[in-house]
A protein has these predicted regions:
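Short amphipathic alpha-helices within nucleic acid-binding modules
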Residues: 19, 77-82
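Short glycine-enriched loop/turn motifs at secondary-structure junctions
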Residues: 1-2, 61-66, 96-97
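Vicinal oxygen chelate
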Residues: 31, 42, 80-120
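Short, charged/polar surface micro-motifs in flexible loops or helix N-caps
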Residues: 46-50, 60, 75-78
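N-terminal beta-strand motif that seeds the catalytic metal site of vicinal oxygen chelate
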Residues: 1-15, 67-71, 119-120
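Core segments of cupin and vicinal oxygen chelate
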Residues: 7-48
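Short hydrophobic/aromatic beta-strand element in the GNAT-like acyltransferase core
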Residues: 40, 50, 70, 102-104
Length: 120
């Protein structure tokens, strides 16, 4: 079994696409509108995992506690500098634990994003 994507329902599609491209480093794999009130963008990493951004006009929840997505980065210091340059609030870390270092930000939809640099 292979986890192929996660879906985030959003009312901020354009802002979300920019976040996942510029901060996380994903690239748009495909984008389409299956119906007049629905737009979908899939953003992909270099290993094939995708984030599906779904805008369908329905209300989104502000209660996203307990949900987070983790993304491995090459350099935590460089990623932290990028995040700060974009005025994105860091709400946890940077923290060093055995095997890795990480910090947390929120995407435009309030989803917690953990950015991780594994020790090599």
């Amino acid at each position: 079994m292979n986890c192929c994507w996660c879906t985030i329902t959003t009312n901020k599609l354009e802002e979300s696409v920019v976040f996942y491209e510029e901060v996380i480093g994903l690239s748009v794999a495909r984008r389409f509108s299956p119906s007049p009130d629905t737009e979908i963008a899939f953003l992909k990493d270099n290993r094939g995992f995708e984030v599906e951004l779904l805008k369908n006009g329905r209300p989104t929840s502000d209660d996203l506690n307990g949900i987070s997505l983790g993304f491995e980065v090459e350099s935590l210091a460089d990623t932290l500098a990028l995040v700060k340059s974009k005025n994105i609030f860091v709400f946890g870390g940077p923290t060093k634990v055995p095997g890795c270092s990480f910090f947390f930000v929120k995407d435009p939809n309030g989803v917690s994003i953990q950015l991780i640099e594994n020790d090599h």
